[in-house]
Swiss-Prot record:
Organism: Roseiflexus castenholzii (strain DSM 13941 / HLO8)
PANTHER family xref list: 54S RIBOSOMAL PROTEIN L39, MITOCHONDRIAL, LARGE RIBOSOMAL SUBUNIT PROTEIN BL33M
Pfam families: Ribosomal_L33
Encoding gene per record: rpmG
Name the record gives this protein: Large ribosomal subunit protein bL33
InterPro entries: Ribosomal_bL33 (IPR001705), Ribosomal_bL33_sf (IPR038584), Ribosomal_zn-bd (IPR011332)
Amino acid sequence: MASKKGNRIIIKMRSTESAHTYTTTKNRKNDPNRLELRRYDPTLRRHVLYRETK
């Protein structure tokens, strides 16, 4: 039997100012649009904006 798709998917988030990426999960139902979060970038050593990529 095939199981149905869950609501949580794994996404990549890329820094807008460097090449650093984070991987995280998001709920499709609660966040149907692309995420934008301020996270710590270790290459720049400061918080920058991260955007969800495909």
